[in-house]
Each structure stands twice: as C-alpha cells, then as structure tokens.
Amino acid sequence: MSGWMPSPGNALAPAGLRLLRSLAAGSAVVLSVVLPTAVAAADEPAGATVVGRLVQAWAESFPGKAGHADDGQLSWVEPAEGDPVLVDSAGVEGVPSGSTVAVTLGTDGPDGSGDGALPVLDTQVLGHSSSELPAPAPSTNQVTVAMVAPAGSDPAGDGTTLEQVVSAVEDRVAPFWAEQSDGAITLGVTEIHDWTAAAVTCEQPGQLWDDIAARVRFEPGPGKHLLLYVSRGAGCGYALAEVGTAPSSGGRIYVTDTSTSAIAHEFGHNFGLGHSSAEQCDGAVEGGFCRTVAYRDYYDVMGVSWSQTGNLNAAQAALLGLLPEAQQQLLSVKGSAITATLTPLSGRVGTRALRLTDADGIVYWLEYRTATARDGWLASSANRFGLESGVLLRRAGGLPDTSVLLDGTPTAAAGWDGDYRATLPVGVAVTVSGGDFSVVVQGLTPAGAVVSVAPNSPAGGGAPAAPAPRIPHGGVVLPGSGEAAAETLAPTVEEAPEVGAPQFSGAVQRVGPDLEPASEATRGSGALVVGAGALLVGSTLLVARRLWTGALRHH
C-alpha cells in the first residue's frame, strides 16, 4: 500500500506508551486482537537502525471489554524483510504514515515492561508516499471478492456463498455509494474467488491480506479494493478496513457479514472516513460535564451498523468532496448574521448544509433531516430508536471520529443512555463553540428548515468548548496525564425496548456498552478510555465494533 499518505484532516493525536503496552499484551484479555502479532514480538537491539515504511494506528476497544489501555496512537516500522518493529509514537510524531524512514532505536521499553515498544533516538525521513498517484477511470472502483477460511477454521467456510457477497456489493452497497456521491463513486465487482483456506489467521490481518492477494494475483492501486469475506467461526473481528485518503485510494477490507450497512461502512474507511460518533453533555450542547461515545450517530452510515443504512452526513460528505459548494453556505465567526433555508439532506438539491467556522478554525455543520428518500424510515416503524426529523448539529474532527453529533436537546447525565433525541429545538437560541455562534431554528416544513445564525466574534480569539472524553464500546476512564488511576468498571446501557435494536454490546452476550457511570464521568478534556484493537491510517487499518439488528457484531 505504499504510495498513499494521510491528508492533514486525518492527522492523529499523540498518545502515551500505556496504549502500546496494552496492544502488545491485549491478546490475553480480548477475544481477538487484530494488531499483527509480529509487531508486538519485534526484537531489535538498542542503537540499531531500522529502515522501512512507517505505519500508524489508532487503538479501539472490543465491545463490552473493560480493562484495556487508552485509546491512542500506535506506530511501527515495516522493513522490506523481517518483522515490523513497534516504536514510540512520540519519536515519529509529525512523520506522515506511509513514509520511508530510518529509525535509530533506544533501549527496550522505557518502563521495563518488555512490551516491545522501543524508544526512538533519531528519525530520518528517506522518502514520502506519493500524493500524485494516477486516478482510476472516472466513477470506477474495482472490487476483487474472495471467500476465505483463515487457518484453523473449516476450509469449506461458514455456509455463506460467493453469490451472496457479490450481490451485497453490486445490488446494495454500490448503489448506496453511487447515490451518496451523485455517481462519482461506482463500485463494481471485477474478480471473484470462491472459498479458499488461508495459511494464516486473522490475528495477522496484514499477512492474511497478503496471502490471499498473492493467491488471487490482486495488485493494489488507486481505485482497487480487495474484499475478503472471512468465516464467522474463525475467531476474527467483525470487520477490518484500511483507511485511505480519498475515494480513489483503493484499499483492503475483510468482513464477516453481508449486511449493507456493514460493508458500506468499511468502504467508507477505504475512502478516507473515520467514524460518526456522538457527544453528550450534562444539560448543555457543549462544554462542562460531557462524554463522546463512538459510533452513536444512528443517522449516518459511518455510525453504528443497524437495519438502516443512513445518509452520509454533511461533515463526512464534505471530507470526501461529495458536498458541492453550491449546496453549502459558509459562515465564519467574523461574518454577519444570516438566515438561510436548509433543504432536506436526502433531497440532494438546494442548500443542504451550513458550515460554521469558529475563531479557532473548528468547523460545525448544520443539516436538515426529514423522512424523505433514503431517510424515509424516520417516519416508519423501522425507526426503532425514535430518531427525530429536524436540524442536526455536528462538529468535524480528525480520526477516529471525523464527525461528532451534538445533542441539541441535552438531558441530565443520568438520562444519557436512553436519550436518542438530538435535533435542535424550534425557536430556542443554541450556543455553539463557547458562544462563537448563536443558532435559532425559526421553523420547519417538509420543504425546508429556516435557520438563523448570529456570529459573535471575540476580541481576543475564540474559546470553544473542549472536546469531551471519547468513550468507545466498553472500557474504563483513565486520567489523560500522569499515572493511571484505579480502574472503575462502568455499568451497561439498558437495552432498547424493541427486540433487535442494535446495542453497544459485550463480546459474548447482548448487553449495553460499558460506559462510564454518569456520576463518575470525567470532567474536562483530559481523560482517555481504555481500548484494544487498531485503527490504522494512510496505508493502514481501521477496526470498528458494529452491531446488526441486535446481534453481536465486533471488529
């Protein structure tokens, strides 16, 4: 996958070595760890120089599994020959993923943990991934589908047929992305390969992809995707996808399900998207006592997977360049007050989004969701969570949450778990970004939402609300600096009353996510949540825990 590099919008935040230790040892505490075992086992002497491709990752927890390490960045160097070498992310900070580097290593494990994460004494960038790859043919993304039984599983597979997977891509996923991109993204299955027994397990996903790619003669490149369907009984994660930089990046995926939302979500990662998550604050839209929950945007395909495959929201569409300038109106904190009419996002005409940029350059998006076209389920019995039509407010961000849904009708922390209402109230001024903007929804009709926005330019720069601590599926909250506090297991969320509604489930039983108790949630922005798994950026991987109609789906 050399030749691909992350865009500035996909930059990763720094992270501590506690994360690296957890991923190296995580196989003892989770059902499966997707980080290649060779990374954790790398053994290089102090002072050695390793030359290879830099790979960067973001760790996330398996659902319902508490007691791992913080979310954060992983980095390793892949030499041309031999095992990858896990290194301290701080030593390669600012180096784009995919670059060719020469890294001089320090002594083993700065805290003596023996985790294999090595300090970096010096880093030299020998070459960057080319950002000038030739684009594929217009509106063409070629998909190679292969059915795979990882080592140790039944070589005959799990009963899923090649035809089912091909149909999922061509009949459901391809039309979805063609619709979302107004025809700019066209997925087509160009090669198919029936069940084959792999020589490696899912614990080494890179090697699994490489093994199958060699067998089917798949050549990576722009607009080329390798989609593996792997046996459900092989102990693999629910799904895994490389994170690209654009819809033309191509990339590799494996899935254990043929659901539309699951496969469409994974292609979204290949195209360059992170997750659509949600932030909840105690009685406020932003600021104060808050939490951010991974995947909790049920409106959006990049949120949790369930029976509805939601429209790509404005923040995610803009990230891919799929929201035309003519369909968005821009306003900065230094601008003048405006009143605009937002047309339904699903209608794909008119002004579909307002983009607000605060004093620090943070971008917020307003969009109008109605029960029309792809969002028609909002007015049907399929709307299991009672999601509302109305104006939604999101904050754009970097990986892993490239979109964060804000709660326009916030409740007290005690009611967070059962609160799925997020639309802005009509006739009520809502403060955005610590007062940089005041937003009022003046009225709603099926044809549009009238929205007034008044900027408040601060004299000495903005003071936006700090991002809330991010809470993935499962985990405990730890301090963001200093030594880890005593771990506190969190309660589960009550299951929605409708049978089959997706939940943030545990690894072996249908339960809610292990969220931090509202009474114990961390104030401010200095908390991290434990995690294991991997989100790899650029020419790397993304692991997402997803659920389908109430049954466990983990990856």
Q: What do the PLM-derived regions correspond to, one by one?
A:
Residues 62-63, 151-160, 309-314, 373-377:
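Short, solvent-exposed loop/turn elements at domain surfaces
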Residues 90-93, 250-251, 346-513, 532, ...:
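Non-catalytic C-terminal accessory/binding modules of secreted extracellular proteins
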Residues 507-525:
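Short, aromatic-rich amphipathic segments at membrane interfaces
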Residues 64-68, 134-136, 291-292, 378-385:
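Short consensus segments that form the blades of beta-propeller domains
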Residues 220, 225, 232-377:
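Extracellular hydrolytic enzyme modules, especially secreted metalloproteases
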Residues 2-42, 527-548:
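Secretory targeting and sorting signals
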Residues 43-75:
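Structural detector for short beta-strands of small beta-barrel domains
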Residues 83-84, 90-102, 106-262, 271-283, ...:
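Propeptide-to-catalytic entry region of secreted or membrane-anchored zinc metalloproteases
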